[in-house]
Amino acid sequence: MIDDKAKEIQAMFQKALGHCELTDNLMGVRYTKLSDNSCFSGLATALGCLVGDILDNRKAMECIAYNGRECATIIKAKGITPVECFGLCPTEDRVCFETKEELDQVIAYWTKVYTPFRAQKASMIQDLEKGRKCEINFINGKFVEEARKLGIETPFNDMIVKCVTEIQNGEYTLEEAWEKNLDRFEIPSL
C-alpha cells in the first residue's frame, strides 16, 4: 500500500535524485531485476566476459533470448506481473518466441536494452576476481529452484549455474570460460 509517508519519502528522493517511482508491486520489481541479472550477469559470468562481448556474438545472444524466455515463463507461472525497470520488462510478449523471426525480434529487444551497458562487468565476475563466492544460487539458481517447483525445464539457467559454479570452485578460470562454455549451451532448432 502506498501511503502518505511513502509519498513524502518519494518527494525527498525526487528532489535529491530527480526521479523516484513508487510501486506496490514489489514482487514484480524483484523478478524483473532477477531476470535482468539472470540473463546478462549470469551469462557474462559463465562466459567470463563483458556485456558487449555477448551483444557482439549471435550464439551468446541466442542464449540470452532462451534464458530470458525461461525467466518470463516462470514469472508468469508464479502469477507475478513484471514491472518495467531501465527499459526491461520480462513479459511473454517481449521476450518469448516460437519462430526464428520472433527470436530475431527478441534479440533486437535485448540488444536495445543492453547496448548502453556494453562496457559493464557483471558483479558476479567482480566477486570471483576478488576470490569471493558470488550470488549465482540467488539469481539463476533462484529461477532453477522456482522452475523445479512448477515443473518447468530451465536448460539455460541450469547451464549458467553449472558453469559459474565450476569457475567459482576453481575448475577453470574466468579467462578460459568463453572458450570452454559457449559451446556447452545447446540452441534448439526453431
Placement of each model-derived feature along the sequence:
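NAD(P)-dependent Rossmann-like dehydrogenase/reductase catalytic/cofactor-binding core
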Residues: 14, 62-190
